[in-house]
Amino acid sequence: MSDQVKITPMTLNFGPQHPAAHGVMRLVLEMGGEVIERIDPHIGLLHRGTEKLIEYKTYLQALPYFDRLDYVSPMAQEHAYSLCVEKLLKCEIPIRAKYLRVIFCELTRILNHLLNISSQALDIGAMTPLLWMFEEREKILGFYERASGARFHSAYIRPGGVAADVPSDLIDDIFKFVSTFSKFMDDIDDLLTENRIWKQRNVDIGVVSKKQALDWGFSGPMLRACGIPWDLRKSQPYEIYEDLEFEIPVGENGDCYDRYLVRMAEIRQSIKLLEQCLDRLPDGPVKTDDRKIAPPKRSEMKESMEALIHHFKLYSEGYSVPVGETYMAVEAPKGEFGVYIVSDGTNKPYRCRIRAPGFAHLQAIDIIAKGHMLADLTAIIGSLDIVFGEIDR
């Protein structure tokens, strides 16, 4: 009689120093041979205590923390925070500022999806899309720099409007970029979409059902790839989105390939939105008239003592926000990015809670990847579009 051998799963560490980990992610895998039986994600390696740090800053000083959350699509986070503070202040912003916000938020969406698609392709072994797409990303970062002075951490969208009006020739350059970008997207389509190796690595990999997506709190392209047309720009419109025409791309199977297709389609919809905004962009101010919230112009400060006092008070003490609490969410490139602020009537938030879409997507990695081969894990992680700045906070 032979002794029965009990086979236990092998434990394997994936990351945190791994090129496909997209930052500082550590996964503890239980493997049955080459098949994944269980995944335990370990987070917190990039934790900085952002929510607590915000409690010690004025409402304006807290803004740059949001750029550093999802650092590949910074303006979307600033936007959510600014809308949340404006809701508490009951502050109306000029129409030109709304248009500029939407223009830069849609450029941010393109910026994010270009990085995600190129890195997903690189994880699987295709290097060409990365080289092509980073050239286009560089152009968008150039627009960021010309508008705000910074390529990444721009702090451009602020409570009360935007930091400053854009240079006169920037709008023309964005228009030129947008008009030729569809041709570039066609080239990427030709390169990837029907490529048989790309399809073999992505079709029917990491399938998520509609019920699972809703149960785990998915949003953004992850939810829409399952066939649920949920987009905050349509369902709970903010800024000027109700006046713009665009469609919500949805998938059918909820697999890695559908998530890729949804992001590709979203880039095309962003181009459509940008064309409408650039055509209709009105003239006028870009900040609210309330000098307790937005600083006065330099020319005013040279002539008016009150303007100088307003400027000094704004950047030293800040403004007090009425007592109350509110939640505001925007359709960020990765999903629903929400900010919940509790104000106690002082110049600093009493509590600020951040809802990061990537957190909900990463927590479901066990159910998504279970039963797949180890080689498929890189494709699944690439399709989740996770950044640890916002997950660890």
Curated annotation (Swiss-Prot):
Record InterPro entries: NADH_Q_OxRdtase_suD, NADH_UbQ_OxRdtase_49kDa_CS, NDH1_su_D/H, NiFe-Hase_large
Enzyme Commission number(s): 7.1.1.-
SUPFAM superfamilies in the record: HydB/Nqo4-like
GO cellular component terms, semicolon-separated: plasma membrane
Keywords per UniProt: Cell inner membrane, Cell membrane, Membrane, NAD, Quinone, Translocase, Transport, Ubiquinone
Gene Ontology terms, MF aspect: NAD binding; NADH:ubiquinone reductase (non-electrogenic) activity; quinone binding
Compartments where located: Cell inner membrane
Catalysed conversion reaction: a quinone + NADH + 5 H(+)(in) = a quinol + NAD(+) + 4 H(+)(out)
Statement: the UniProt record of this protein carries the keyword Cell inner membrane: yes
Catalytic EC class: translocase
Ranges in a coiled coil: none
Lineage: superkingdom: Bacteria
Keyword Cell membrane assigned: yes
Membrane topology qualifier: Peripheral membrane protein
Function: NDH-1 shuttles electrons from NADH, via FMN and iron-sulfur (Fe-S) centers, to quinones in the respiratory chain. The immediate electron acceptor for the enzyme in this species is believed to be ubiquinone. Couples the redox reaction to proton translocation (for every two electrons transferred, four hydrogen ions are translocated across the cytoplasmic membrane), and thus conserves the redox energy in a proton gradient.
NCBIfam families, alphabetized: NuoD, PRK06075.1
UniProt record similarity statement: Belongs to the complex I 49 kDa subunit family.
Subunit: NDH-1 is composed of 14 different subunits. Subunits NuoB, C, D, E, F, and G constitute the peripheral sector of the complex.
Protein name (record): NADH-quinone oxidoreductase subunit D
Organism name: Ehrlichia canis (strain Jake)
